[in-house]
């Protein structure tokens, strides 16, 4: 017998394959305050019991593999393994269930969303024993969330920087999103800002293309910002998209934006990646830049109800990685978003303490222990008739962005911006006077349009525009 064989025998090694549930299904386990908790929607293959499928998820997303290995004896699996501690049925779905998994904190690198996701939503999603798998929710314990810087500034600091209080912020994505020269792009920015918007925005796929290189765009947009500020007396900003092919190039663009003195930059955090995003968020805090986050690619991950990852998880990840704004759907516009579920993850972005509420898709109570909040951005197919609903749904701590709803105005960009600003101010005033925005919204807009020809023209253009499709994302 070789020394190696003796070593295996000495640690009690028994080769072979055994059911995951024998090690990783622990229904009597009491979760710890320091555990990271996950709720998975599991659709196993026919013949795979729920306990085995849930245990397989816990194993393959933590310490397990498909067979027993002799090195198991060199560590304490009981200390490091993930545990499937509860299984519950999904109402109306005979083939699905929710598996709750607890992960010891030591499994994850501090301050790294990249490492967190590499385990929890890594290879486990490719298991043949599962037909589909979706991560519905995460509980991030204070012991882990405190290892993250989080948003560069947060909601209150942003309001103080901008000197804007008591209402949602107004934005606009410049259209057409691709094809404008830098000078014409800057002109469009200026017209929108002078008309009354707080922000304009690069679209998510505006980086540095042949028709408009990033440096030229940054310079012309900065000129537009300063000119609009001088004329209006208000602080203005444009989300300069710093997303690039390399982290080094991204940082170079952020540095140039800071040198221009602009207040905010932007990043596509899913296509750009969490490592790049966290690096940029740290730079923004250190250098006084706000950070706007676009979620391009999210629907590839979160749109399917039985596989992938819900956006509420991506929203939590962004709050840890860092961003001052993030797109969050509109409920009433052209993009997917059911009201209660949307407000559930909006609360996870903004609030400090969020109670478990399954009716809104919140699987776990979340205590952020003073991690700065993120402003949700409503953007996509919205116009002046939506303003009462948006104000009522999202409240003051939000950004309402009207791209086509500004640049599509028949009189041009500046009148489009005026129409949106007048509509917003009318809705905020009506709300503050105690009026019901949900019930009286159209009347409030019609009353305001009597005093604003720009708003009246916008009301006429979009009076029949609706996006009435059933939401895919339901409980």
Swiss-Prot record:
Posttranslational modification: The disulfide bond which can form in the large chain dimeric partners within the hexadecamer appears to be associated with oxidative stress and protein turnover.
Record-given protein name: Ribulose bisphosphate carboxylase large chain
GO molecular function, one term: magnesium ion binding
Note: The basic functional RuBisCO is composed of a large chain homodimer in a 'head-to-tail' conformation. In form I RuBisCO this homodimer is arranged in a barrel-like tetramer with the small subunits forming a tetrameric 'cap' on each end of the 'barrel'.
Family label: Belongs to the RuBisCO large chain family. Type I subfamily.
EC category: lyase
Binding site for substrate: 123, 173, 177, 295, 327, 379
Signal peptide: none
Residues the entry annotates as binding Mg(2+): 201, 203-204
Site entry: Transition state stabilizer: 334
GO biological process: photorespiration; reductive pentose-phosphate cycle
Keywords, ordered alphabetically: Acetylation, Calvin cycle, Carbon dioxide fixation, Chloroplast, Disulfide bond, Lyase, Magnesium, Metal-binding, Methylation, Monooxygenase, Oxidoreductase, Photorespiration, Photosynthesis, Plastid
Active site as annotated: 175 (proton acceptor), 294 (proton acceptor)
Enzyme Commission code: 4.1.1.39
Residues the record lists as N6-carboxylysine modifications: 201
Residues the record lists as N-acetylproline modifications: 3
Subcellular location: Plastid, Chloroplast
Catalyzed chemical reaction(s): 2 (2R)-3-phosphoglycerate + 2 H(+) = D-ribulose 1,5-bisphosphate + CO2 + H2O; D-ribulose 1,5-bisphosphate + O2 = 2-phosphoglycolate + (2R)-3-phosphoglycerate + 2 H(+)
Subunit structure: Heterohexadecamer of 8 large chains and 8 small chains; disulfide-linked. The disulfide link is formed within the large subunit homodimers.
Cofactor note: Binds 1 Mg(2+) ion per subunit.
Known cofactor(s): Mg(2+)
Superkingdom: Eukaryota
Cross-referenced PANTHER family: RIBULOSE BISPHOSPHATE CARBOXYLASE, RIBULOSE BISPHOSPHATE CARBOXYLASE LARGE CHAIN
Pfam families noted in UniProt: RuBisCO_large, RuBisCO_large_N
């Amino acid at each position: 017998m070789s020394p190696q064989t003796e070593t295996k025998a000495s640690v009690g090694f028994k080769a072979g394959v055994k059911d995951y549930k024998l090690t990783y299904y622990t229904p009597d386990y009491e979760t710890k305050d320091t555990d990271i908790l996950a709720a998975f929607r599991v659709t196993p293959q026919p013949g795979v019991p729920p306990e085995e499928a849930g245990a397989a998820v816990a194993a393959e997303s933590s310490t397990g593999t498909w067979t027993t290995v002799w090195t198991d004896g060199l560590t304490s699996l009981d200390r490091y393994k993930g545990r499937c501690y509860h299984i519950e049925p999904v109402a109306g779905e005979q083939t699905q269930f929710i598996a709750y998994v607890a992960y010891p904190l030591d499994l994850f690198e501090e301050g790294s969303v990249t490492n967190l996701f590499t385990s929890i939503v890594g290879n486990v999603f490719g298991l043949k024993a599962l037909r589909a798998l979706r991560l519905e929710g995460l509980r991030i314990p204070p012991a882990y969330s405190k290892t993250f810087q989080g948003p560069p500034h947060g909601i209150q600091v942003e309001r103080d920087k901008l000197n804007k209080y008591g209402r949602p912020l107004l934005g606009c994505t410049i259209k057409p999103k691709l094809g404008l020269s830098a000078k014409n792009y800057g002109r469009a920015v200026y017209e929108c800002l002078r008309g009354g918007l707080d922000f304009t925005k690069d679209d998510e796929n505006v980086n540095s293309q042949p028709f408009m290189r990033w440096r030229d765009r940054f310079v012309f947009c900065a000129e537009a910002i300063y000119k609009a500020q001088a004329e209006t007396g208000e602080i203005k900003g444009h989300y300069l998209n710093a997303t690039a092919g390399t982290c080094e190039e991204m940082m170079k663009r952020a540095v140039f934006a800071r040198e221009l003195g602009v207040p905010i930059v932007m990043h596509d955090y899913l296509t750009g990646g969490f490592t790049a995003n966290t690096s940029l968020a740290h730079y923004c805090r250190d250098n006084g830049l706000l950070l706007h986050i676009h979620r391009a690619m999210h629907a590839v991950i979160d749109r399917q109800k039985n596989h992938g990852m819900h956006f509420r998880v991506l929203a939590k990840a962004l709050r840890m990685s860092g961003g001052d704004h993030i797109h969050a759907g509109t409920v009433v516009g052209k993009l997917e978003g059911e009201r209660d579920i949307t407000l559930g993850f909006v609360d996870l972005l903004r609030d400090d303490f969020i109670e478990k509420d399954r009716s809104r898709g919140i699987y776990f109570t979340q205590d952020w222990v003073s991690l700065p909040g993120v402003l949700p951005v409503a953007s996509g197919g919205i116009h002046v008739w939506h303003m009462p609903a948006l104000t009522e749904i999202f409240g003051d701590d939000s950004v309402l962005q009207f791209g086509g709803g500004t640049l599509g105005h028949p009189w041009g960009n500046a009148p489009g911006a005026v129409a949106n600003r007048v509509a917003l101010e009318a809705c905020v005033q009506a709300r503050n006077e105690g009026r019901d925005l949900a019930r009286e919204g159209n009347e409030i807009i019609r009353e305001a349009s009597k005093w604003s020809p720009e708003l009246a023209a916008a009301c006429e253009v979009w009076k029949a525009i609706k996006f009435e499709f059933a939401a895919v994302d339901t409980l």
